[in-house]
């Protein structure tokens, strides 16, 4: 496996729990449609999803990985190193309370992308020399998509924090269509979104809008 180029511009995060009114199969189909709508990265994050058995989870992850591959979308697994290894995923994304970047790197090797979440200036500074390939910073705004989200950073502080950053980085948390313009002009390499795409009537249009904003100012 050779490490691919990672286009972070339209970074989609979702699992079946983000379509709570749907069955697992229906939710998987909805996620697949969004993956094919023009996103550049898909992160399989299924926290809160209840499976009848573990092999059902693996089957869904494999289906979404295949859809991602066919769409030319990088497939990232959230937190679960063993699943990422079993799938030979393009990458793994971890948080501050998970294993260290160095320990995860030992397990997944150099070929797999390794992303790290940061929520404040101190974490961002430490992350620069952590060995992570890219960072996810947020929440930028208040968000309902994650129950355990940290205090929102705000656009003013985020702008200052990004001056100290040297790594590829995506912003996340409470992003709406109305905030795309101000976010596109502060030095982010991409925007990571959940509800902006899962609740969109036209995901393709939204994905295109995000990409245009980011690449225009990139």
Curated annotation (Swiss-Prot):
Pfam families: TMP-TENI. It catalyses: 2-[(2R,5Z)-2-carboxy-4-methylthiazol-5(2H)-ylidene]ethyl phosphate + 4-amino-2-methyl-5-(diphosphooxymethyl)pyrimidine + 2 H(+) = thiamine phosphate + CO2 + diphosphate; 2-(2-carboxy-4-methylthiazol-5-yl)ethyl phosphate + 4-amino-2-methyl-5-(diphosphooxymethyl)pyrimidine + 2 H(+) = thiamine phosphate + CO2 + diphosphate; 4-methyl-5-(2-phosphooxyethyl)-thiazole + 4-amino-2-methyl-5-(diphosphooxymethyl)pyrimidine + H(+) = thiamine phosphate + diphosphate. Binds 1 Mg(2+) ion per subunit. 4-amino-2-methyl-5-(diphosphooxymethyl)pyrimidine binds at residues 43-47, 78, 117, 146. Mg(2+) binds at residues 79, 98. One of its GO terms (cellular component) is cytoplasm. It comes from the Bacteria. Its EC number is 2.5.1.3. Keywords: Magnesium, Metal-binding, Thiamine biosynthesis, Transferase. Its cofactor is Mg(2+). 2-[(2R,5Z)-2-carboxy-4-methylthiazol-5(2H)-ylidene]ethyl phosphate binds at residues 143-145, 174, 194-195. Condenses 4-methyl-5-(beta-hydroxyethyl)thiazole monophosphate (THZ-P) and 2-methyl-4-amino-5-hydroxymethyl pyrimidine pyrophosphate (HMP-PP) to form thiamine monophosphate (TMP). PANTHER family: THIAMINE-PHOSPHATE PYROPHOSPHORYLASE, THIAMINE-PHOSPHATE SYNTHASE. Belongs to the thiamine-phosphate synthase family. This is Thiamine-phosphate synthase. It comes from Lactococcus lactis subsp. cremoris (strain MG1363).
